[in-house]
Amino acid sequence: MKVLITGFDPFGGESINPALEAVKKLPNTISNAEIIKLEIPTVFKKSLEKIEANILAHKPDIVISIGQAGGRFGITPERVAINIDDARIEDNEKNQPIDLKVFEDGENAYFTTLPIKAMVKEMQESGIPSSVSNSAGTFVCNHVMYGVLYMINKKYPNIKGGFIHVPYIPSQVVSKPNMPSMSIEDISKGLELSVKAAVENNTDIKTAQGEIC
């Protein structure tokens, strides 16, 4: 089995992206699955082009993309991606799409095909804060999650795919009072446990991970 796991380069004025740094720290094998690590640009369209090129090159069974969500307290596997690009800031090539569809012929939304509740359980049982997220935003993270699931739906039905958001690391919040953070070691361990759950669970578990509002 092969798992393609991607991490974004730094964006939004940050000098580091914990998503990419945590991906780099992952072992090359998890639960007997080969781990293929890929840096992708925080750029609309180009990020998806790079992922698809690596899908074609490596033929992975699972694709997991990792992104930074500053302000979140834990590691949050995403439940759903929506067909909208609505960028509050420019990407790394100064693109700023507003109210545009990711793909004109795509569904309004695609749900993850990863066992996200099993992932959360693995992390929580190891003492790593984690919960299911019901919004991947409308920036490049959602763009990538939606785009990968669109490709899976249209071209690669045997691949499982989804997205995980991670918090800031401590060095990023020195000048951001009261902003939560997590060590890069805990983030990487959480991702390793998430990959383990994805490899070992063909279907998700039934646990309450919903939100009131």
Curated annotation (Swiss-Prot):
<dbReference type="GO" id="GO:0005829">
    <property type="term" value="C:cytosol"/>
</dbReference>
<dbReference type="InterPro" id="IPR033693">
    <property type="entry name" value="PGPEP1_Glu_AS"/>
</dbReference>
<comment type="subunit">
    <text>Homotetramer.</text>
</comment>
<dbReference type="InterPro" id="IPR029762">
    <property type="entry name" value="PGP-I_bact-type"/>
</dbReference>
<comment type="function">
    <text>Removes 5-oxoproline from various penultimate amino acid residues except L-proline.</text>
</comment>
<dbReference type="InterPro" id="IPR033694">
    <property type="entry name" value="PGPEP1_Cys_AS"/>
</dbReference>
<feature type="active site">
    <location>
        <position position="165"/>
    </location>
</feature>
<protein>
    <recommendedName>
        <fullName>Pyrrolidone-carboxylate peptidase</fullName>
        <ecNumber>3.4.19.3</ecNumber>
    </recommendedName>
</protein>
<feature type="active site">
    <location>
        <position position="141"/>
    </location>
</feature>
<dbReference type="InterPro" id="IPR036440">
    <property type="entry name" value="Peptidase_C15-like_sf"/>
</dbReference>
<dbReference type="GO" id="GO:0006508">
    <property type="term" value="P:proteolysis"/>
</dbReference>
<feature type="active site">
    <location>
        <position position="78"/>
    </location>
</feature>
<comment type="similarity">
    <text>Belongs to the peptidase C15 family.</text>
</comment>
<dbReference type="InterPro" id="IPR016125">
    <property type="entry name" value="Peptidase_C15-like"/>
</dbReference>
<keyword id="KW-0963">Cytoplasm</keyword>
<keyword id="KW-0645">Protease</keyword>
<keyword id="KW-0378">Hydrolase</keyword>
<dbReference type="GO" id="GO:0016920">
    <property type="term" value="F:pyroglutamyl-peptidase activity"/>
</dbReference>
<dbReference type="Pfam" id="PF01470">
    <property type="entry name" value="Peptidase_C15"/>
</dbReference>
<dbReference type="InterPro" id="IPR000816">
    <property type="entry name" value="Peptidase_C15"/>
</dbReference>
<keyword id="KW-0788">Thiol protease</keyword>
